[in-house]
Amino acid sequence: MARKQSVIVVGAGVVGLLTAHELSRAGFAVTLVERGLTGREASRAAAGILSTLFPWRSPRPLALLSRWSQSSYAMLADDVRRASGIDPEWTASGLLCFDLSEREAAQGWAQTTGRAIDFLDAHEVRKQEPALAEHARPAIFLPGIAHIHISRFLRALREALLNEGIPIKEETAVTGILESGGQAQGVRTEAGELRADHVVITAGAWSAGLVASFGIQLPVEPVRGQIIQFKGPPGLLGRVLCQGERYLLARRSGEILVGSTREMVGFDKDITTEAREELTRVAGELLPVLKGASPMRQWSGLRPGSPEGIPYIGSHSKLKGLWFNTGHYAYGVTLAPGSARLLADLMAGRPPILDPVPYKPDR
């Protein structure tokens, strides 16, 4: 029997975890390497909304990848639940967007794509969300939007991979890529060298620094996003609420998340009073019962910003055997299933789910 091709996946966020899963299913021998603990960077800081919020604004490559991923999430969440015993709480919630200036663009998008959309008056919004009471106002309704409990999803993915026999080397920082004759040979870590036929970079905001020594200029940079959390009763809110790049969602437990900021501050992950005050104000506007309430938690994560938010998926011409799945900006959770499948298709030589050209790392 032929030896399996070996792969080292660098970075164990949601993109790295699903990449490892898809590559294992494609017949590769996979090892996942993580500088810290699984899913503790941008993935853990995400709200878990499985949408780009304003899908009609998305460039075509982002829209196609998002649509493929969204269509796969319900089955993926169920598969992961059965494989791990942990329910990631995939929830088909729908989304209410209060930016009525987007109506014409949203209507055109729906007609072009065939996606369901509705325009609700204040009375119809109040019927859907009684908690808004007299504060209900007209909205654009996207019934196909879902969300997932990201912490539970990350735990479930980690457990599922371990149950598949995929090694996860945590607290193992990669310091360089091993190379010989223009071919990636593995990685150098603080604990020693790890050899493999292929190396996949899924390190989010830290991706560019891992390959700069090869003259690869990957335009991925950190963008800080901060989120606050309130405690509410279960069932208070069913839909995701969205206005002006800000959102609010309620988990099944009653936790209410409000986000998010987008700050160019380098690798600074500090939380700020300014963000807390701004998001608290937004919370009171979107859900008036939160006016005057104090958030119980605040956190931040560094998203891997890239031009137009279009990720880099595929190989790079400067080093054979080096692959990328990074640069998803604020949509890593949304795009992870499709990104992982597309990369696995390319590495396995299968017909790809989407045209890979728009995502090329050396585009």
Q: Where do the PLM segments sit?
A:
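Helix-loop-beta segment of a Rossmann-like dinucleotide-binding subdomain
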Residues: I86-C97, Q107, Q111-E164, T261-G266, ...
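Helical element adjacent to the flavin cofactor pocket in flavoenzyme catalytic cores
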Residues: I140-H198
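C-terminal catalytic lobe of FAD-dependent flavoproteins
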Residues: L287-R363
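N-terminal Rossmann-like FAD-binding beta1-loop-alpha1 element of flavoenzymes
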Residues: Q5-T31
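Dinucleotide-binding Rossmann-like beta1-alpha1 core, especially the glycine-rich loop
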Residues: G48-Q128, E245, V282-G284
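Active-site substrate-recognition segment that forms the wall
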Residues: L18-A26, R35, G48-L50, L76, ...
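Residue-level detector of alpha-helix initiation sites
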Residues: V9, G13-V14, L37, A205, ...
